[in-house]
């Protein structure tokens, strides 16, 4: 392997800012922030907006969108008839 061309692979804390959930994993992500983890060590911190703890698919708090209503709105807006 060539020296100096590979990103630094290290342990990083990912923090979900919407649900105050954090987990530690290995990553090459770059960040300037750090946080003290539960084990007392300091790790780089990367903040994410959505994780499995806050995403509607994983939390079961999904809402179904009615595509039929959107089609009807479009047809009304542009005066398109169904031609039946």
UniProtKB/Swiss-Prot annotation:
Signal peptide: none annotated. PROSITE patterns: RIBOSOMAL_L31. One of its GO terms (biological process) is translation. Keywords: Ribonucleoprotein, Ribosomal protein. It holds the Pfam family Ribosomal_L31. The keyword Ribosomal protein applies. GO terms for molecular function: structural constituent of ribosome. InterPro entries: Ribosomal_bL28/bL31-like_sf, Ribosomal_bL31, Ribosomal_bL31_B, Ribosomal_bL31_sf. One of its GO terms (cellular component) is ribonucleoprotein complex. NCBIfam families: L31, PRK01678.1. Belongs to the bacterial ribosomal protein bL31 family. Type B subfamily. PANTHER family: 50S RIBOSOMAL PROTEIN L31, CHLOROPLASTIC, LARGE RIBOSOMAL SUBUNIT PROTEIN BL31C. Part of the 50S ribosomal subunit. This is Large ribosomal subunit protein bL31B. It comes from Alkalilimnicola ehrlichii (strain ATCC BAA-1101 / DSM 17681 / MLHE-1). The gene is rpmE2.
């Amino acid at each position: 392997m060539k020296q100096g061309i590979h990103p630094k692979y290290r342990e990083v804390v990912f923090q979900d800012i919407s649900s105050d959930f954090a987990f530690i994993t290995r990553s090459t992500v770059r960040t300037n922030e750090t946080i003290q983890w539960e084990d007392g060590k300091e790790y780089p911190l990367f903040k994410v907006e959505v994780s499995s703890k806050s995403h509607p698919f994983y939390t079961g708090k999904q809402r179904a969108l009615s595509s039929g209503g959107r089609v009807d709105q479009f047809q009304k807006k542009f005066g398109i008839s169904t031609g039946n």
